[in-house]
């Protein structure tokens, strides 16, 4: 059988053709555009993720700072069954001269014992402080407290002797309680004096932030703890209560005063702390991630005298 051959006319088939230079250029340009879009999308997502992570970290730092401030406020003035808001300086039997007035039980008041204080300069070397610091003091159980931080108290008196108190008999002697008075034994507490200060400022040319300073075993400020970065201002306001109704004053309510002025003669019922970063603080170089104000509200134990909440 004869095969039929396909006759292709001359000039009718030139073979397979490749891409032209123009087509290569167009394809390459499209590839570059796609690559730029992918890279841009990646870096945008990375930037947003970094900003979100940094914002989350700062919010967590602020929440931790709020927890510490609220706890210190609730503990302020408490030394066992002795509460500073119920006593005057006459109930402080003995106190050695402190390295800083802020470490004294009497504070600046000439009558009432005030468990919180303000200070424009806490006196920590190298620290540039902005506005006033907020200071709390109280006692925590510690039988091995150093001589500089030992505090002994009963329900009616307190002493910071400047030495360790190893026995109950020594504690009763400091508090001028007769050794034969056994009924007072359960009221006597041997504690460590805690003084915590919160201040906004900076060290050298470093960034400003909120720092916490604590009284150490040597009776000095210990190493500061950075609680939150980028904080530039701490505004503290106080809540004072007055006009407590008597039992026969039916329908009468106590009066609350909300003020930014600290009264060194009256224990406030509460404090409000506003932490602010200012309008020029940015997160992860993103102009739309300004750190806004953070408000902390805390009550002071024994401050609301109308409620008689001293325990």
Give the location of each predicted region.
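Aliphatic-rich helix starts adjacent to a transmembrane/signal segment
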Residues: 3, 15-78
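Short linear sequence signals and composition-biased patches located at protein termini or domain-edge surfaces
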Residues: 57, 64, 74, 80-106, ...
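Extracytoplasmic beta-strand-rich oligomerization domains located immediately C-terminal to a leader/signal peptide
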Residues: 53-216
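Residue-level detector of short, conserved catalytic/binding motifs and their immediate flanks
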Residues: 19-22, 132-134, 196-198, 208, ...
């Amino acid at each position: 059988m004869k095969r039929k051959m396909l006759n292709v006319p001359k000039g009718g088939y030139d073979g397979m053709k490749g891409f032209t230079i123009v087509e290569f250029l167009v394809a390459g340009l499209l590839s570059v555009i796609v690559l730029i879009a992918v890279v841009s999308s990646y870096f945008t997502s990375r930037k947003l993720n970094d900003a979100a992570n940094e914002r989350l970290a700062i919010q967590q730092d602020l929440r931790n700072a709020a927890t510490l401030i609220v706890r210190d406020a609730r503990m302020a003035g408490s030394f066992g069954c002795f509460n500073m808001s119920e006593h005057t300086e006459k109930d402080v039997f003995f106190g050695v001269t402190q390295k800083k007035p802020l470490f004294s039980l009497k504070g600046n008041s000439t009558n009432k014992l005030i468990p919180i204080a303000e200070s424009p300069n806490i006196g920590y070397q190298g620290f540039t402080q902005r506005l006033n610091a907020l200071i709390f003091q109280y006692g925590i159980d510690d039988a091995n407290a150093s001589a500089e931080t030992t505090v002994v108290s009963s329900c009616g008196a307190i002493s910071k002797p400047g030495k360790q108190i190893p026995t109950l008999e020594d504690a009763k002697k400091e508090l001028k309680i007769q050794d034969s008075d056994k009924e007072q034994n359960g009221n006597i507490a041997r504690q460590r004096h805690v003084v915590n200060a919160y201040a906004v400022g900076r060290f050298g040319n470093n960034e400003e932030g909120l720092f916490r300073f604590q009284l150490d075993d040597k009776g000095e400020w210990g190493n500061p703890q950075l609680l939150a970065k980028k904080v530039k201002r701490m505004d503290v306001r106080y809540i004072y209560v007055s006009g407590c109704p008597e039992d026969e004053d039916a329908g009468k309510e106590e009066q609350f005063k909300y003020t930014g002025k600290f009264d060194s003669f009256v224990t406030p019922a509460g404090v409000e702390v506003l932490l602010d970063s200012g309008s020029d603080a940015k997160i992860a170089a993103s102009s739309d991630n300004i750190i806004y104000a953070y408000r902390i509200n805390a009550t002071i134990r024994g401050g609301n005298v109308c409620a008689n909440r001293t325990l």
